[in-house]
Structure formats: structure tokens, C-alpha cells
Amino acid sequence: EACMSIFRRIFDGIHASREGSSAIKMFIKIREGFILNKVMSLHDAVAKYVENGDTLAIGGFTTNRKPYATVSEILRQGQKDFIVYAGPGGGEVDMLIGEGRVAAYINCYTANSGYTNVSRRFRAAIEQGKLTYEDYSQDVLMLMLHASSLGLPFLPVRLMQGSGLMKFWGISEEKRKTMPKIENLKCVEIENPMVPGQKVVAVPVPKIDTAIIHVQQASPDGTCIIMGDEFHDIDIAIAARKTIVTCEEIVSDEFIRRDPTKTRIFGECVQAVVKAPYGAWPAQCYDYYDDDDAGLKEYDKASKYQDAEDAVKQLEKAAAKAAKALEKAPEDEKLKLAAENAQKAFELAKSGEKIPETFKDFLEKWVYSCEDQSALLDKLGGSRLMRLKNEPHLGYSTTH
């Protein structure tokens, strides 16, 4: 108890500075790493470790091992004003953006690959000037997150030299001065101190408050097994001050020790462990279940429209566009049918008789009306979930 008291005082002093190397960051996390059982409910994990204004890093890759369960809980609880970093993001980031929870987004690519080339609420927010956004190449962003795990002050790269990414800034230098958690520069060309006359590009290194990650297996102390590609999840788990891990199943310490080579994230990096079966739904989780084709198609279709009012406006524009195309070729039967259908869809929506499913409808159906992950699974039903389940030793579903 006396030793713990000393450790607590030392670590509290370090934590107060919030600065320093990756070693110091790790020591901060070790204080909570002494806790051998970090299992808690998803509600409690989000309430305790996700705060308004956090710099949030999201694990996974487009439709792979995305922490949808945690994002859904964040939406239910109402935390907002996040600075979000994600490797290639997907619908989980799109949902946060569509609900207005993101103050700034630093990314390289956002899509539900194979379903939506560019996530629709993300795209609409940028086109309407509602989202503060910065764009890096995928390789540079991954290196930035890795540099964060190493505690580097900045990162020298050569990967963006000569590209438009150097010239075009989504967040101006002036605006950056008004956002304390955004670095003062997107990038700057500097001289390589090792090779006189050679130029390199210096990019900032994010300071991550909270990482949210979904894995296949985790032990109560937070030790994680990731099957398949790890993406940037290990880096953000190390870099973040707080890490929430959801998992398909909680395994024993003995299970972890049987094959320690499978360990990818150490318990010292994790503050909360949450059992959340199908926690990546509608995305896939390698060796457990495939992505839900029906769910991702539903989201793609619904996310075209923010809400009913937006649906009416967009359908009106579509009808006008179809009518204009018909004017140029009035004898074209295909254009005539398209114009008739577009006009009918607009009139039905305007009258309220038939409004297509919208983004808001999707969230009400699959997020807000579900008290928790168990309620979501009940709504999806066992038959649908079993069709997604991977066959042992194959790594994919044979019925989906």
C-alpha cells in the first residue's frame, strides 16, 4: 500500500505536466495498469473515459474491425466537439460527423469500401462547409500515429513532397491559432540536418486523449489479441492517455500465456475492457464474422439524406435534373421514364406519403432505440447474426 501511494504521487506529478516522451506517457498509464480487472460495461467505460473536446483516435480500417459499439454508445451519451484522427475511416466516423459531434477531422480516406466510395455525411459536411477537415496521404497519417506512440515532437517525411497536399490546407494557419488542440502547421519543408541541401517535410504528431479499439480477444487486465491485420491500433493504444477496448470475447490470463506471441496490445496501455459481441457490426471482424452486406447497403442508401427535409430537397433537385435531361432528348423513352419516376418520388416525399429512409432514421433504428449492444443484437436477431459468422478454420462465412 505504501509503494502504491508513492507510485501514485510520482505518476500524478508526471500526469500534471501532460508532456514528455513515450516512456513518460507509458508510466502515466501504468498507474491504472496495476488494476488487474478492467472489465466494465460499455456505458461506464464511455462515461468515464470519453469527454467533450477529446482528441479521439479510432481503430480499424474502413469496414474492418471498426469500434461501432463504442461509437454508438458515444452517440447515445452525447459527448461532442471531438478532434478525430482515424486511419482510413468508415461509417463510424461518418455517424459522428453526421450527428455534429466532430469539431475537426484529420484523416486520409473515409468510406465504406465496396459500398460507398466516399462516406456521404462526411462528404456533405465538407461540401456544405460544416466540417473542419485536414487531409494527409494515408502513408503519412499512419506514420504520424506511429510517431505519437513514440512520443516524437514532429515527424520528418518525404512522402508528400511535390504533391498538392503540401499546397492545399484544409485548416488554415490562422484558424489553427484558434484551436488549441490542433497543431499550428499542417506541414513545413525543412532542411535535413543529416544531409545538407536536402529537404524533408516536417508534419505534426497528434496528442491523443482517447483511443477506441475493437479486438477479437482481451483478458481482464487489457492484454489484447488481434487476429489479422493490426492497422494502426497498436500505435494509438500506446499513444493515447486513455484506451477503451471492446472485444468479441474475454479470455483468461492463462489463455493469453499459452501463446504470448499472439499478444498485440499490452494491458498497461488499456483502461477499460468491454465484452461486446459483434461490436464491429455492420463491419467485419476477422475470423469471427463478415461485414453485413444488408446493413452496409442500408446505411449507404439512408445516409444520402440527413433527414426528411433534406430528402425532399434532394429529390426535388433530382426531378429537375431529370426533366432537364429529357428536354434535350424528348424522344428518349429511358429518359422519359426516369423523369416520371423522379418527379413521382419528389411528389410522394413532399406530401409525406413516402419519404425514403434517412440518416436520422438509421440512427434511430440501430443506435438510439437500442439501450445497449445486447439490445442491438436482439433487434438484429440470431438468424441474421449466424449468417455472418465465420466458419472455423476458414476465416469467412459460407452462408453470407
Regions from the PLM with identified roles:
Residues 5-327, 331, 336, 340-400:
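Conserved alpha/beta enzyme-core scaffold
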